[in-house]
């Protein structure tokens, strides 16, 4: 990575924007950054890390200048690989108004290689990741590679023992293979040991699980399933019998319900006939009603029209009188408009001209008045401005004096940076002292805590062991009891076989009783049905006679009625359609009574319905007799099929024997279940106790191991604590102070006062600039005011001249100067009055003529409508008489009496239709139900017996099914546990293998042997590279090697390649050797990156070197730079500054003037 350009604003001591051009700075390969202590030299390096990684290398969070609320950095750099790429990173930070902390506002990285700029990433986190991806180094690696900090050159060369190993671990980033890996490994081993203990506890829970137990349970399950299948068949048979009985019982109840409904319907017949007649008359009346309504409506409209015609004729007379009066008024108004109006219009025009002139005059007077006021105001304002200018000059002198006093105060408050650094070092040591003390105390407390935990675990382990032995003893006792119980238990098949015999005997006795009862009931039904059938047939014969007589009467009356209708329709001269005669005699014939005919028809309809009902009853009785006869035959056959064997054995003695066996089996099952539950409960408790025991055993071992480790750490902590305490006392003696914090507080107070003073100077300078600007503005305004005053006075004279001219002109036109608007309004009022009078009369005349014309048209229209209505009245009467005759109403009143609306008619018809439908449905339902019943019959006692038998069979099947489910669950659980046991054994084997590997690793990484091995190999490569550089710098005089223990050995080629210890080197020799080693180390760290770093900074304290040694160092530095590597030196020494071909001078911040500034100098 090659830097191109850096811009800084608001970072540490840099307040205003400063730009550093690295292309010019690195042109000669060697350059220096110079400036006094605290000027901001290192801040330039911070700006690069802040741009690339979003933070400074010194890990400070308060890096924004105190006088700024925003911070901007941008860094342009180049990557020189196969293809040269250029990038620009820009970041902006803001200060939080509430907390005062610095927060990132924006960040972006762009590719500026070509003509088109491409934004690669935006946002702080994304930009951080992109920069690390491009360069290939983290922040820590970058700072170790680019900068060699002060005081670190010779440290790496001379360190030995633990400090050397720790430094190597940090430099090569091997922490993850040292303590971190050891801690991870210890945690992993502890975790796996815990898993092993838990696994051992879990395996204890599978002691009674094996293939023999599984086989035994499967045999029991098979035996129980066979019993269950037999019981299921018996239950299915009982279920079929129950379903058939349920159907028959339901059908019997439904037939009884339908017969009751049919009887209720027959009682409502007369009421329904009356409703049917009312509906028929209502429909006829509804047909006549529209004609009646039309006729009555026509009469009403005729009366209304007559009244309207009379009203309009009276209105016509009044309008005629009003028209004559308005014609006279219109004539007078027209005369005024044509003669007087033109004169008034001329006068109005002259007055308007005068008013315009008067308005111009008034405006000019107002302008004059405004100018007079403005002249007075300008005079006063000019005087005030001159006074302000004098006051402003006094303020400027006062502010200048205050700034000079504050600058003197700031100089007195400055504290040397070296002193401040040593105080900071003391505070850091004090903080470290507190941390070491806390760590030491914590280790002591942890050691005590683990000792208590160890004692607790040991005590609990012993208690759990005793408890476990007790539980195992109980488990053995219960297991023996269960084995003894299984030996004495009778087999299940004995009870089941006896139960089958008992059930068979019960069923036969029940069926025998049922068949006898059904046989008796069927015989009774046949006898009753035959008696009813005889009665019904006698009633049917009588009903047939009645129907025959009524039919004869109806035929006679209908014949007479037809002859009467024919006679009525015949006209004189027309041929009779029956006899052909043209002479018709109508007198002497008696009119047929239609009401009597309707009564006979209604009576016949009733007889017909009754006959139909009686027929249905006879058919049902005959069907019932046939069904019962078949049932009697079937019952006799069923009784014979039962046989005589079941009567030989007493049902009561069989039931007693069965109950005894059943009680014995139930007692055994209860005891066995209780023992199984006790054994299961004890096994689970034993397993839990075993797991707890193993857990406490592990805790005891871990606590014991941890106590040993903590004691070792405590000894190390005490040693480190004593070292820090000694260092603090030495530093206090050197600085001759007792309290670092109090001294730092004093320094910070001085800094705070200095910052406040600087802020005050800044405010005063700003105010001084404002006062200078105000003075210039006031002088400029005062000059402009005087010019405007002169201009306004000349304008005032011109206004006086124009006013006099306008007054003379108005008097010539009108004669007066005042009251012009009143005169104008008076003339306008007269003109308006004449015009309004004429317009009003003309408008009223038009309105009267419109009213007269409309009234005349309405009278003509009403007469025409009256004539049409009279014609319609005659037509409506004819139609009404015709429909009354067709619907057989004597007059309008009769039709109105029988009128019903559609809703009432529909309601009556609906009731009739509903009745007929219900009767038809009931008859049909009875017929369908009889067919479904198929002559079957069921008594209530028999139905109850069927239900009880079904419940008993179901209960037996359910009990056997539940036992099967329980046994299946046990088999399934044993199978699952066998699989789990297999997995646990496999896991145990894998865990033992893993623990073996972890133990080997623990031995390998013990005492950081692996870290030393890796670091030593890295160090050998670095020493080879460092030896080459050292030979180049020293002209082949010295070389560098590493022995088997990782210690650096110097080869002195001036003395035949003799080996020398690093401690024997002089100051200059140590410096050049350390420099060569540091450069090689930097290259090694760079190998991790994806881009070569072409810049190297030495932030080294050269002040301790004498002139000869400094010459050697500078010669060395001039040799190591090249085209691909630029070397920068950060220093404040003038001797080094004179040797540098390119120099970047950093000027420190000045209170009240601005922040640090940079300047490039080239020799």
Swiss-Prot record:
GO MF, one example: ATP binding
Top-rank lineage group of the source organism: Bacteria
GO biological process, alphabetically ordered: DNA recombination; DNA replication; double-strand break repair
InterPro entries tied to this protein: P-loop_NTPase (IPR027417), Rad50/SbcC_AAA (IPR038729)
Function, in words: SbcCD cleaves DNA hairpin structures. These structures can inhibit DNA replication and are intermediates in certain DNA recombination reactions. The complex acts as a 3'->5' double strand exonuclease that can open hairpins. It also has a 5' single-strand endonuclease activity.
Subunit structure and binding partners: Heterodimer of SbcC and SbcD.
Name of the protein in question: Nuclease SbcCD subunit C
Organism annotation: Clostridium acetobutylicum (strain ATCC 824 / DSM 792 / JCM 1419 / IAM 19013 / LMG 5710 / NBRC 13948 / NRRL B-527 / VKM B-1787 / 2291 / W)
Organism ancestry: Bacteria, Bacillati, Bacillota, Clostridia, Eubacteriales
Gene expressing this chain: sbcC
